[in-house]
Amino acid sequence: MAAENEASQESALGAYSPVDYMSITSFPRLPEDEPAPAAPLRGRKDEDAFLGDPDTDPDSFLKSARLQRLPSSSSEMGSQDGSPLRETRKDPFSAAAAECSCRQDGLTVIVTACLTFATGVTVALVMQIYFGDPQIFQQGAVVTDASSCTALGMEVLSKQGSSVDAAVAAALCLGIVAPHSSGLGGGGVMLVHDIRRNESHLIDFRESAPGALREEALQRSWDTKPGLLVGVPGMVKGLHEAHQLYGRLPWSQVLAFAAAVAQDGFNVTHDLAHALAEQLPPNASDRFLDTFLPLGHPPLPGSLLRRPDLAEVLDILGTSGPAAFYNGGNLTLEMVAEAQHAGGVITEEDFSNYSALTEKPVCGVYRGHLVLSPPPPHTGPALISALNILEGFNLTSLVSREQALHWVAETLKIALALASRLGDPVYDSTITESMDDMLSKVEAANFRGHISDSQAAPAPLLPVYELDGAPTAAQVLVMGPDDFIVAMVSSLNRPFGSGLLTPSGILLNSQMLDFSWPNRTANHSAPSLENSVQPGKRPLSFLLPTVVRPAEGLCGTYLALGANGAARGLSGLTQVLLNVLTLNRNLSDSLARGRLHPDLQSNLLQVDSEFTEEEIEFLEARGHHVEKVDVLSWVHGSRRTNTFIIGVKDPRSPDAAGATIL
């Protein structure tokens, strides 16, 4: 009995012991959906207002923790076995009682000392949380299409730049290192998500049609007058807008990072070497050839190429901002003159009227996650529609991969047909209605009901309009220590855009090819009225930077994804999301697995080189006409599970790189 009483006394006191008290004042560990090392988020001075919120204030949490552990009444204390309280049986004024009273005073001193010690430890812990140095290095990841640009993004993060600072520098770097895919003379779209505030913004800097552009001119001369294909570039305005909203380092410093790459030179990537050897613009000027083929022949991968002309442009933009690009200065005049000399109609007024748009992304819930993607004129709604349709199928590890591929192929036929009906909503109000239908779970169920489990549809379920998006695009994905997620995709449309190079070294885009007009393609696809040519309008786009977050709360999986390949990129993103969110595969495996794409114009189901003969035979037995190609698209990704972050490139890309801060 004495041993039991002693144990009971230890148990009762243990509730107030210093070690246990320290444990209850620690912040709760977030649940993880995959193994990951703990890495608490670092507090920032500019987040003080956010930390003052009752749901996130450490002081409030500590107070609530104490209140939960303190006994609610004296009777509760008295109910503890081995309590020091006893019934008084002697005269309290007697000598014996006085001796007992002295013993009780001693116990009070011990308990008081323990509580005082615990309080001191708690205060020290709180001071360490607020004022101490971080005990664990912050994590982050950067993924781009070129290893040198990934390294540049990491350098910006290491110098206390924000996630957007890193993305801007990396995107400008890609305009130097991958000029066939992106550049100052192009445009794009950036999606930014703030994890702590659970806020998302999309910055749309898609090119717009010149005010004097007419459909008739494109019909007659688009293939002989490359200047007609040039839209008003949005790259500089868009990146500057993103920096104004989320930048931490000075604008000039961010641009100086990229200018150094142009000035010092870079190693020619495999993809650029291939583009210069196989995809040289037919109208390449002497200036173009002198810039990219300085030795008179395509450079080999790894050879050094310098762009001092672009370094000078970036220095000007760093000092003067976007005004030097858009407000009638030398850069503006050069771009206008170059396009007009090649038959274009773009003017200085078109440049001065251009603005980047800041808006909300479209979103849909899929398997407990919120999927965020760009709204029209981008095809984010079609991506979410594909996920909504697939959500109703029994896609588990128990279902054969071949059966799942059949469902995916039939679903993508519907999603791509829906995408062909989108365009710029500013010029057509019906596009908003179409978008709402694409985001509807009810509509998705209706479409799902038309998909056979055993047979490919002999004809498209919906009318299909012309689909011919930009085949090349550059990707930047950043998850920084500041708890921001950035996904960005930019493009010039065709390799090297229009092929027109200004004296300052700016390649001009060919984005007007993304509009639809009669007899635009060799197969004479029906033109889309929603995507017809109009002055100031932005064409249909398959640039789809995509962010995924938990549908409820802040704990769980976050993703940043991007893709190139136009419509094939939408197909690739759908399948990667399916692999990660439905089949619970890790990101590396999800990106590496074989992907398919239904080409609606040719009625061929294209599959990449990762497909086995057995899978192809299964699809053909279901009525699909299969065509095997080497690569359909590159899909890069970054994943965060609570505080564990990883950046992963598509293994199909020979030059891309993902880097992670450990």
Swiss-Prot record:
Heterodimer composed of the light and heavy chains. The active site is located in the light chain. Cleaved by autocatalysis into a large and a small subunit and the autocatalytic cleavage is essential to the functional activation of the enzyme. GO terms for biological process: glutathione biosynthetic process; glutathione catabolic process; negative regulation of response to oxidative stress. The keyword Acyltransferase applies. Belongs to the gamma-glutamyltransferase family. Residues 72-83 have a biased composition (Low complexity). Residues 1-106 are cytoplasmic. It is found in: Membrane. It comes from the Eukaryota. Hydrolyzes and transfers gamma-glutamyl moieties from glutathione and other gamma-glutamyl compounds to acceptors. Its EC number is 3.4.19.13, 2.3.2.2. The modification Phosphoserine is found at S17, S72, S79, S83. The chain crosses the membrane at residues 107-127. Pathway: Sulfur metabolism; glutathione metabolism. GO terms for molecular function: glutathione hydrolase activity; leukotriene C4 gamma-glutamyl transferase activity. GO terms for cellular component: membrane. This is Glutathione hydrolase 7. It catalyses: an N-terminal (5-L-glutamyl)-[peptide] + an alpha-amino acid = 5-L-glutamyl amino acid + an N-terminal L-alpha-aminoacyl-[peptide]; glutathione + H2O = L-cysteinylglycine + L-glutamate; an S-substituted glutathione + H2O = an S-substituted L-cysteinylglycine + L-glutamate.
